[in-house]
Amino acid sequence: MKIELIVPGKLSKHLQPAFDYYVEKLNRFAKISVHFVELGGDLNTEDEKTILKKEAEHIKKRLKDRKFILLDLWGKELTSIEYARFLENTINKLSEIVFVIGGPLGIDDSLRENALAKISLSKMTFTHEMCVILFLEQTFRAFKILKNEKYHY
């Protein structure tokens, strides 16, 4: 099983240890890859719509017409157990699962409209970098649930 995450920008150095930790843990269950694509521009010099459209183009280049699941503030909220079941059902339908997280300004509507599904990590607002860590942690937790393994050690 392959899981890919596409996200604009890059990860801050202070989040790298958590990122590495969860990627290593997840590789026990699936081949995980995270691809950071170029941001859409400078908020100080360009308007939000232009930046969102540019980011959408960078994401679409990476997607190459593949189906994807969008992690979005307006998506469906799931418990960890519900997310595990969602992941299991998706694994049974697709050989590869691609997730997309928006950049600092969110996501362009063109991507939102074409998502296979939309999931919310929370109704609270997090930086897109924190969403990467939360996604990795929740996906690791989901696999532990599906394997009936204890999460806490």
Swiss-Prot record:
Name of this protein: Ribosomal RNA large subunit methyltransferase H
Gene: rlmH
Pfam families in the cross-refs: SPOUT_MTase
One GO cellular component term: cytoplasm
Family (UniProt): Belongs to the RNA methyltransferase RlmH family.
Its job: Specifically methylates the pseudouridine at position 1915 (m3Psi1915) in 23S rRNA.
EC number of this enzyme: 2.1.1.177
Keyword line: Cytoplasm, Methyltransferase, rRNA processing, S-adenosyl-L-methionine, Transferase
Subunit details: Homodimer.
InterPro entries assigned: Alpha/beta_knot_MTases, RlmH-like, tRNA_m1G_MTases_N
Subcellular location, record wording: Cytoplasm
Major localization listed first in the record, in broad terms: cytoplasm
Keyword DNA-binding: no
Enzyme class: transferase
Lineage: Bacteria, Thermotogati, Thermotogota, Thermotogae, Thermotogales
